Amino acid sequence: MAGGGHRPVVGTLHLLLLVAALPWASRGVSPSAAAWPEEKNYHQPAILNSSALRQIAEGTSISEMWRNDLQPLLIERYPGSPGSYAARQHIMQRIQRLQADWVLEIDTFLSQTPYGYRSFSNIISTLNPTAKRHLVLACHYDSKYFSHWDNRVFVGATDSAVPCAMMLELARALDKKLLSLKTVSDSKPDLSLQLIFFDGEEAFLHWSPQDSLYGSRHLAAKMASTPHPPGARGTSQLHGMDLLVLLDLIGAPNPMFPNFFPNSARWFERLQAIEHELHELGLLKDHSLERRYFQNYSYGGVIQDDHIPFLRRGVPILHLIPSPFPEVWHTMDDNEENLDESTIDNLNKILQVFVLEYLHL
């Protein structure tokens, strides 16, 4: 995570929210070209009934996720390290084995760091890249570089191995339903799903605009200059982002997620409603509504994280990061031993329901 810690960018919050709220036409997009990018502003979820919720809860497996997705990522994986390559290969292989016909892209680039030029590689996995609109789930797969201490290495379990594993489990558990996006009668559905695994979120030395967010800064600029749909004039891949849902620092017990952005509040409220429904159906483990995950308060600033380069370009953001941060943040204790299985399992169910409702599956 969020190498900026709890330093909010209060001074720029109002400017960033203003940019995010601007209609595309005021940013140089012609009215005709802006028609489909505006559809996200009116999009409504298809609310699932209790039978469907039970089916989703039964279809996700925390033990399978733990063994097959998470544990291989609990290694040192700072950019350019052997562990970074291993993590990247693991993520790609887990996606390639699925039936839903994901299209994988590796965005590799060089960037100056405090240690000279380093290579970074973002992983972009997209269902139906030609679909105009995509719901985007994202996290970072790099771990922060720390010197070894007492033969221990920093594996960043919450930061952000667990979010990566949650996204992989979502793709596995919903594979058959996501496959239907490719096989619907309309050969090119208007709305689909994209997963982004950022490299280089963490600072090598001290968090700064230059030493942080390497992967997201590069990818946001690249997507802003890439026409979408292919050959379009006036709209880019960023216009095709309905909502960027960024997961970070997840896996510790009793997380509390505030709402960060007013323009995505209705989607945050949907997460609250899903959490409540799953609780009422008895589908959440060790869960109390008195200490629910998605809280009824707004955060008075912006936490520095991979959403920032996209926020500045007007992409709607749903930032799923707890406040306060886990106690183990940026310590050697951010490891498997200190993860809470029930919390992760519950959040898996909530996120999977959210995605299916958003995509009308």
At which residue positions do the language-model features occur?
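Secretory-pathway/membrane protein signature
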Residues: M1-L361
